[in-house]
Curated annotation (Swiss-Prot):
NCBIfam families: murA, PRK09369.1
Higher taxonomy: Bacteria, Pseudomonadati, Chlorobiota, Chlorobiia, Chlorobiales
One GO MF term: UDP-N-acetylglucosamine 1-carboxyvinyltransferase activity
Binding site for phosphoenolpyruvate: K22, N23
Family membership: Belongs to the EPSP synthase family. MurA subfamily.
UniProt xrefs under Pfam families: EPSP_synthase
Protein name: UDP-N-acetylglucosamine 1-carboxyvinyltransferase
Active-site residue numbers: C117 (proton donor)
Keyword field: Cell cycle, Cell division, Cell shape, Cell wall biogenesis/degradation, Cytoplasm, Peptidoglycan synthesis, Pyruvate, Transferase
Length: 424
């Protein structure tokens, strides 16, 4: 098993190009199952464990994939199986994304109930509700979702989501593009990753109106074509790198971004005392002195993203004053707090709100990763902690960050990856 060993006290400074987005890559890859023609070529796909897991799932389904230098090619003509087995799905909740495409293309899908990050309940009820609205008969038995399209093809419908859900919106969208008739998705997630999925489906020939809004109108079609497509940048990775510069009193330039996708995060960095500059595809953060305590509330886009909540909490341990961090998306996403407190932070939990008392001098020790973004928060804390911090179980981190230790090394961090055994 791998761990990251970090010697704190080095400033993060320099220039870097943002990686491709994991959270848009996964639904885009899933959407290739909607077409049985030709070979898809997808650029700017991050080299992550979740991408590897998805490729293994596609191999099981009968697709052919190849990955090199962040370009993924996929041929789906020979896909025959509609079974996504537990052995693969348990590794990653996003495997549920194959439900909509398989059901839309073949009229049947059998997908194991998903696994993934270990914080709080993240039910798939909204995914199943959307499939049922489109005419699927859903049964759950022996740990599998069995979905069958009545009459062999899904039918357009109006889907009103009671709460915004990126995953359910993506699944409904992919199912609807091959459904007979018109589908309206209300209270759709408007995250940039859903917008990117819409653009990909439109390139394939789908008729989608309302891209980038909370109401999507989809006119179903009979078939879709293979395309070449470039993925968007990873706004969460970019935000994490900005936080690394801010927590160490450094400065960083990130190229290949879309600043409008990060407005809420950039505003909070500014509120916290950092100087932020942007161009069409670049964001620059410069530290200006002591950080100021700044409250955040994690909510659906365009608000502050829940996937940056843990990193912001680490940052606020070094800010002057008391900050409140509330998560309205995942109320129990606070597994990182005990580990941050082990490093010397002073953070209290009050329901779905955390109160961070800063600034606190952090001291390096061994800490345990519990999920993807919690891991990132511990790395950030390690960058500023006195002495050596060991972040264990970094396989969580590898699910969402492409060689983060190398990228941080290139910006001045003293960080390395080592093997270890949990049994001695």
């Amino acid at each position: 098993m791998d761990k990251l060993v970090i010697t704190g006290g080095k400033r993060i400074e320099g220039e870097i190009t943002a990686s491709g987005s994991k959270n848009s890559s996964l639904p885009i890859i899933a959407a290739t199952l909607l077409s049985g023609s030709g070979t898809f070529t997808l650029h700017r796909i991050p080299d992550l464990q979740d991408i590897t897991t998805f490729r293994q799932l596609f191999d099981h389904l009968g697709a052919e994939t190849a990955f090199s230098h962040n370009t993924l090619t996929i041929t789906t003509a020979n896909v025959q199986s509609v079974l996504a087995p537990y052995e693969l799905v348990k590794k990653m909740r996003a495997s549920i994304y194959v439900l909509g495409p398989l059901l839309a293309r073949f009229g049947h899908a059998r997908v194991s109930l998903p696994g993934g990050c270990a914080f709080g309940p993240r039910p798939i009820d909204l995914h199943l509700m959307a499939m049922e609205k489109l005419g699927a008969r859903i049964t759950i038995e022996t740990g599998f979702i069995d979905a069958v399209a009545e009459g062999g093809r899904l039918k357009g419908a109006t889907i009103d989501f009671p709460v915004s859900s990126v995953g359910a919106t993506g699944n409904a969208l992919m199912a609807a593009v091959l459904a007979e008739g018109t589908t309206i998705i209300r209270n759709a997630a408007a995250e940039p990753e859903i917008e990117a999925l819409c653009h990909f489906l439109q390139a394939m020939g789908a008729d989608i109106r309302g891209t980038g809004t909370t109401e999507l109108i989809i006119h179903g079609c009979d078939s879709l074509r293979h395309v070449e497509f470039s993925n968007i940048f990873d706004r969460i990775e970019a935000g994490t790198i900005l936080a690394a510069a801010a927590i160490t009193g450094g400065s960083v330039t990130i190229r290949g971004v879309i600043p409008s996708h990060m407005e809420s995060v950039l505003q909070k960095f500014s509120d916290a005392g950092c100087r932020i500059e942007t161009t069409d595809d670049t964001v620059i953060l410069k530290s200006t002195g002591r950080l100021k305590a700044t409250d955040i509330t994690a909510e659906p886009f365009p608000a502050f993203p829940t996937d940056m909540q843990a990193q912001w909490m680490a940052l606020m341990t070094q800010a002057e004053g008391t900050s409140e961090i509330t998560d309205h998306v995942y109320h129990e996403r606070f597994n990182h707090i005990p580990e941050l407190n082990r490093l010397g932070a002073h953070i209290d939990i009050e329901g779905n709100r955390a109160v961070v008392h800063g600034p606190q001098a952090l001291s390096g020790t061994k800490v345990m990763s519990t999920d993807l973004r919690a891991s990132a928060s511990l790395v950030l804390a390690g960058l500023v902690a006195e002495g050596t911090t060991e972040v264990l179980r970094v396989y969580h981190l590898d699910r969402g960050y492409e060689r983060i230790e190398t990228r941080l090394q290139n910006l001045g961090a003293e960080i390395k990856r080592e093997k270890y055994s949990e049994f001695g």
